[in-house]
């Protein structure tokens, strides 16, 4: 009797397994990503950072999505927090369970609570730093679907924050990108109809 029950349950579930897709359906809602980032600085002006982002993108087709996002990051050596707001896009190379992708985030950020101001030391920010500045983050990674509406993403990105930073080689402040290597892990999901 137990064997018969197990076979019956397996047969009932089998069509569901066959129907389960391992990619997002553009007609079923937007791509949502909650992402956590950490990474070292790059070059002489780079800085370690930790952060989190939320992205909400609309599918243009099965491989391309476009939308907006917002986040928070803390820059450890420059001692400031950043609140970026940006446009975001993903391009998935294949429509399958495992899909490599490239993405781009570009927008502005607000610098909050800088502590290392006008010290004329490495990792110092000028007091003339504007309240809003440029943020850009190109990246590449892989998406792995767990179900038809939930997946995991892992990527590497170049996170650039335009800042009026002290350059110890030139012994003055100038506007430059503060570069970081972002190592990103995220949960992506699709809520039908949203």
Task: Please annotate each region the language model reported.
Residues 35-39, 120-126, 167-170:
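Extracytoplasmic loops and strand-loop junctions of Gram-negative outer membrane beta-barrel proteins
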Residues 1-24:
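Bacterial Sec-dependent N-terminal signal peptides
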């Amino acid at each position: 009797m137990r064997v018969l029950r197990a076979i019956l349950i397996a047969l009932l579930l089998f069509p569901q397994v066959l129907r389960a897709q391992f990619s997002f359906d553009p007609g079923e809602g937007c791509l949502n990503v909650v992402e956590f980032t950490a990474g070292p600085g790059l070059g002489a002006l780079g800085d370690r950072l930790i952060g989190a982002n939320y992205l909400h993108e609309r599918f243009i087709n099965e491989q391309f999505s476009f939308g907006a996002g917002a986040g928070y990051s803390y820059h450890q050596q420059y001692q400031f927090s950043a609140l970026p707001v940006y446009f975001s896009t993903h391009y998935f190379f294949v429509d399958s369970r495992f899909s490599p992708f490239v993405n781009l985030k570009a927008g502005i950020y607000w610098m909050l609570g800088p502590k290392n101001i006008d010290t004329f030391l490495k990792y110092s920010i000028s007091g003339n730093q504007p309240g809003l500045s440029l943020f850009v983050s190109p990246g590449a990674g892989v998406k792995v679907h767990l179900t038809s509406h939930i997946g995991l993403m892992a990527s590497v990105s170049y996170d650039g924050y335009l800042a009026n930073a002290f350059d110890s080689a030139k012994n003055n402040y100038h506007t430059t990108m503060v570069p970081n290597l972002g190592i990103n892990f995220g949960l992506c999901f699709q809520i039908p109809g949203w």
